[in-house]
């Protein structure tokens, strides 16, 4: 490690910088504008290869890439775990100073930094998921317009027949919604074609698609969110990362299961979606039996599908790790 470490508290308009020696002596503490030019000027005296810590945030990636360009070692701090180790008093100076302190002592809890290509893929898949949710909202609003006017359609809005029937009703709001749905469908097909063209031949994606209920988009989302299966030495660790392991509360001899641990919300979402699909596509399989058993015992489908999703984590881990296609038994 270099003789100097840096803590950055990055905001949209400004950045608090703390440069610190390994003995804890603060060399520089400065607030600069949130621009690459200003940050480069502020770090001119810092030796190349020094560790530069900053908290994970939605806008941190350009700064990570820029620090790499400047030949520093960017360290992405986990904000939740940093809070557990940081001081109770919290302001900008304490934040950047705390990050520098934790870095020099090798106590900084860090996050995985995916390659830029996978970050772009994650963003595109999340954009696609947002559009799917938006499309569902438009369909629901259109159905609401039908109920207001006591209109009944013989076909679903998902079909061309249903769209044409809705458009021909000559209701202004419904017409606009149908046009919007058509536009979103065309754009979604463009996204799908681009994803298949670019990532359709990836081996992990092909392997994951062998699992019933895991289609191309689900497999690609799992690939983008996990990035490298070697990060997880055991499926239990992947389950924790996905937030699919319930917390255990224990008092004396009594223990109870609480809510799941907080993990990657996108990974948790896609595992649950894939679990629903798997149960539908493979009703005679082991996981479908687990779903039925938990449903009968708890009477709650949501709890049951989470159990299936947790078991699906094991399947994904083994298929990807050992590069063997899933076989239905």
Task: List PLM regions with ranges.
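Conserved DEDDh/DEDDy metal-dependent 3′-5′ exonuclease domain
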Residues: 36, 41-84
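Short alpha-helix plus adjacent loop in nuclease-associated cores
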Residues: 75-123, 160-164, 254-262
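Phosphate-backbone recognition surface of nucleic-acid-processing proteins
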Residues: 91, 207-210, 216, 220-301
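Glycine-rich, often acidic, oxyanion-interacting loops/wings at catalytic, nucleic-acid
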Residues: 125-205
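Low-complexity, acidic/Ser/Thr- and charged residue-rich accessory regions of DNA metabolism proteins
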Residues: 252-253, 257, 290-329
């Amino acid at each position: 490690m270099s003789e100097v470490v840096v803590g950055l508290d990055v905001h949209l308009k400004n950045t608090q910088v703390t440069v610190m020696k390994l003995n804890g002596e603060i060399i520089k503490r400065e607030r600069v504008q949130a621009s690459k030019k200003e940050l480069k000027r502020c770090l001119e005296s810092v030796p190349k290869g020094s560790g530069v810590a900053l908290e994970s945030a939605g806008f941190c990636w350009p700064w990570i890439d820029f620090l790499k360009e400047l030949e520093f070692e960017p360290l992405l701090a986990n904000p939740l775990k940093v809070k557990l180790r940081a001081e109770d008093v919290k302001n900008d100076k304490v934040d950047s100073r705390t990050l520098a302190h934790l870095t020099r002592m090798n106590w900084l809890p860090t996050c995985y930094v995916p390659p830029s290509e996978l970050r772009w893929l994650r963003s595109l898949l999340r954009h696609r998921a947002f559009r799917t949710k938006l499309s569902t909202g438009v369909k629901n609003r259109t159905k609401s317009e039908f109920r207001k006017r006591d209109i009944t359609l013989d076909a679903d809005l998902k079909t061309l027949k249903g769209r044409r029937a809705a458009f021909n009703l000559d209701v202004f709001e419904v017409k606009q919604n149908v046009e919007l749905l058509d536009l979103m469908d065309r754009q979604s097909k463009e996204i799908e074609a681009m994803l298949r063209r670019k990532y359709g031949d990836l081996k992990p994606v092909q392997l994951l698609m062998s699992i019933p209920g895991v289609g191309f988009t689900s497999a690609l989302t799992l690939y983008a969110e996990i990035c490298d299966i070697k990060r997880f030495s055991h499926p239990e660790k992947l389950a924790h990362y996905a937030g699919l392991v319930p917390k255990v509360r224990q008092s004396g001899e009594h223990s109870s299961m609480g809510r799941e641990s907080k993990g990657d919300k996108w990974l948790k979402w896609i595992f649950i979606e894939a679990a629903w699909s798997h149960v539908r596509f493979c009703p005679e399989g082991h996981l479908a039996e687990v779903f039925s058993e938990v449903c009968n015992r708890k009477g709650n489908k949501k709890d049951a599908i989470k159990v299936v999703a947790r078991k699906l984590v094991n399947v994904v881990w083994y298929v990807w790790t050992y590069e063997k296609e899933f076989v239905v038994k």
